[in-house]
Amino acid sequence: GNRLKPQRPGWLSILFQLQGVVTVDPDGKNAKGRWYGMGMEAKPTVSLHEGDLRQTWINGVYENEYVKEDGKWKIKKLHFNLTFRTPYEDGWLKVPVVGQNGPDPVVKPDAPSTSYAPYPSGYCVPVHFKHPVTGK
């Protein structure tokens, strides 16, 4: 039988993981991967015009961890560092999405957020690998 949960009405989320760099540990059982994420979403708004569908652009950086079990690679940790989420109509240069910046009402966070800014302020997500040219 199908064990997948039914989709939430009005939701669409397409997020591509692009330009990946995967580093396998010397033990051959663990790895880390860094990917850029770019995509689009459509979902009901949380507070503004409750229930209206809102289309957005979304962008960020993944820093993931993988583990090899029984000869198969599995995701150990999937971590997305949000750079921006903004209305499709306005583009990402104008405004962040108002009313969708809080926790998802369906998928609750496992811990409180430590900080939030609608756009990054020059922060660069730490890289897990050495620079391929300089080695630093």
Language model: regions and residue ranges:
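Glycine-rich loops and low-complexity Gly/Arg-rich segments
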Residues: 41, 57-62, 99-106
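Hydrophobic/aromatic beta-strand elements that line small-molecule binding cavities or substrate pockets
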Residues: 17-22, 61-67
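Hydrophobic-ligand binding "helix-grip"
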Residues: 26-28, 38-60
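A solvent-exposed, acidic/Ser-Thr-rich amphipathic alpha-helical stretch
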Residues: 1-42
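Beta-strand elements of well-folded, non-transmembrane domains
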Residues: 37-41, 66-68, 82
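Coil-to-beta-strand transition motifs
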Residues: 28-32, 57, 68-75
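Terminal "cap-and-tail" regions of soluble proteins that handle hydrophobic small molecules
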Residues: 49-53, 69-136
